[in-house]
Every structure is written in C-alpha cells, then in structure tokens.
C-alpha cells in the first residue's frame, strides 16, 4: 500500500513525525510532501499567484512552499512514482471538529486527496495547556491510529467521502473507545483586536471565542469530551438537499 503524508503545521512539525511512524506500521511505501512553513487555518486554498517551490530532503521526503492542498496535488501528480492508495493528513496539534473543519488545512489535505480519487483520512490530536505551554499527548494518536486506520481501510467507504479522526486529550490507556460521529456545532465569535504600530497606523489580530452551546450526543465534540476517538465521515457534496426541495416547492420550480 502506497501512502502519501501531508499536514498543515509544516515539514518540521512533531505531528508529522508521529504520522510517519503511524504510516510505517501500515506500509513501507510511505512518502511525505508537506508545507515548508506553517499553513494552519488556510483551509482548502491553492497557491495561484506565485510558483510552487519544491525542496527534496531525501528520497521520499519533500517540502513545498505551498498549502496542504498544493502538497497533495504535487505528491499525486509529480512526486510519487504512481498513484497512492491512501492520503493521510496530520497529525494536527489540536482537534479539528465541528465548524472548525471548514478552516482546517489538515482536513483540506484529506479533502484534496478525495477530490483526486484517493481514499483520505485527516488526523488531529486534542491537547491542553499547562500555563502557557501546550501539552499534546501524541502517544495517544500514535498508539491507536494504526489499527483503526487498518480497520477503516478494510471496511472501506464511498467515493467523495473523507474521514476525519480526532483523538482525545488523554493517555493511550485512558481512551474509552471509538465512536462514529456527526460533525458537531460550536458557537462562533470572531473578533478583531485593533492596535497601532510605531507610526500610528492600525493593524489587527484576529481572535476566535467560543461560547456555550448545546452539544449533540452523536457529535464529534461529545465523543472527544467523553474520552473517545471520533471518526466523522465528511462528504464533498455541500448541497442542502432538504432545503433545495423546499425552495423548489416554494418557488414552484423543479428542484
């Protein structure tokens, strides 16, 4: 099985090293094409205004000055000697759940693999802060992902669907199981922090806040909060089919 790895935290990210160890438990045909720098929050963006610069690190490791989407395209269309059987994106430092999947470069890497006709899985590891220090239990994803991915590949899933895996913030032995979940919903509060530079000109920092919101029992959020691994199938068809039918009826047109 040929596996292509990417991420959005960059070629030197610890999560990518974890992902490679996971992949090597599944196959010895593993390739890495990852961003040269951190591309977090760039979602499914492409680099169109400048050329893509590819740097070969060794025989099967490449860094690209581009987004996770660029990396998957580069891997599938140029770097690999043949099409991969699986694209793995991650392991992200921090969960990618609920509405946050729309911002996630990690999820976008898997999305691009899916668009290119390759089975694809995004992996993210929840963490906590100790003071101002981020504590990420990478060993949890590393311990549980290989077997889970193997089982998922054996089970299979339809074309046009990617799998989004999130691992809870706990030790490997404390994981309480696996849940197949729905994408949850978070309360959304984007705000701007305006400041002034040395010449008095304004600049801004973007901040995201989270208020309290009901959490559905079958959601990715609920699974992670309960100490379970969340497996969420996401499809590329964004059509709201029920609303489409309702609007067609309201307008008296075919839908």
Curated annotation (Swiss-Prot):
Q: What is its EC number?
A: 3.1.3.5
Q: What InterPro entries does the entry give? A: SurE, SurE-like_Pase/nucleotidase, SurE-like_sf
The record's remark on the cofactor is: Binds 1 divalent metal cation per subunit.
One Gene Ontology cellular component term attached to this UniProt record is: cytoplasm
State the NCBIfam families in the record.
Answer: PRK00346.1-4 (NF001490), surE (TIGR00087)
- Which family would the database say this protein is a member of? Belongs to the SurE nucleotidase family.
Its name, as the record gives it, is 5'-nucleotidase SurE
This protein's species is: Brucella canis (strain ATCC 23365 / NCTC 10854 / RM-666)
Q: Which gene encodes it?
A: surE
